[in-house]
Amino acid sequence: MKDLIEYIAKSIVTLPDEVRVTEEADDKSRVIVKLEVAAADKGRIIGRQGRVAEAMRTLLRVVGTKEGVRTRLEIL
């Protein structure tokens, strides 16, 4: 899951070296993926009306469902 979000984020932003992705297990069935990008790239990650962020959350949810865990994406 972490690798997927990192790949997508680095493909979108102008400063790919500033992308940081961490994964935390809240409990047995919940994973929180935290995405940190440069301030200049936050607009690109969120997208117009949040479409890019929502698409990333949807992909993360699909992968999580396959693995049997609930997921959450936090953009910092």
What are these regions (language model features)?
Residues I46-G50:
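Glycine-centered tight-turn and secondary-structure capping sites
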